[in-house]
């Protein structure tokens, strides 16, 4: 059996929220509270892309443009691909498009946080290990 699909990448729409939350929940093994920031879609510094096969969201990834005092930073977050579609280049294509957005927005650098298990994936795209992240959960 040949598994073929058509990958379309587009910006997130309100109608996508339920599928995105379900994908994040399965991918990150935790519950999301169904409360996507209502200002996200209208924020000119927030971009979320989805890959779609027919009406199924197969992947999602976001970038936030942060204008700091001396430079502009692109922060990639929440990259997830439906487990049935992994290994088909979806995650790579989503991240590459986000890097393109960062370049268009004149970001000085683009960063992301990765689990150890996904770090090789990001290295293949061109990311390199740089700093240790420290965190306090509020």
Model-predicted segments: where are they?
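Conserved beta-strand-loop-alpha-helix junction that forms the acyl-donor binding cleft
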Residues: 110-120, 128, 135-138
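Conserved beta-strand in the GNAT
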Residues: 50, 56-65, 75, 80
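Conserved GNAT acetyl-CoA-binding A-motif
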Residues: 95, 102-115
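A conserved beta-turn-beta hairpin within the catalytic core of GNAT-like acetyltransferases
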Residues: 66-76, 86, 130
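Active-site rim helix/loop that mediates acceptor-substrate recognition in acyltransferases
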Residues: 29-48
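A short beta-loop-alpha structural element at the N-terminal edge
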Residues: 7-20
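Conserved acetyl-CoA pyrophosphate-binding loop and the N-cap/start of the following alpha-helix
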Residues: 85, 89-97
């Amino acid at each position: 059996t040949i598994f073929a699909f058509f990958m379309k990448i587009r910006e997130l729409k309100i109608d996508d929220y339920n599928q995105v939350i379900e994908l994040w929940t399965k991918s990150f093994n935790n519950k999301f509270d169904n409360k996507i920031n209502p200002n996200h879609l209208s924020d000119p510094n927030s971009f979320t892309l989805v890959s779609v096969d027919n009406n199924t969201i197969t992947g999602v990834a976001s970038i936030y443009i942060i204008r700091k005092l001396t430079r502009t930073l692109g922060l990639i977050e929440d990259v997830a691909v439906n487990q049935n579609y992994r290994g088909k280049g979806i995650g790579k294509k989503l991240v590459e498009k986000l890097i393109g957005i960062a370049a268009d927005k004149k970001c000085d650098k683009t960063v992301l946080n990765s689990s150890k298990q996904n770090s090789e994936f990001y290295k293949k795209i061109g990311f390199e290990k740089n700093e240790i992240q420290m965190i306090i959960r509020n």
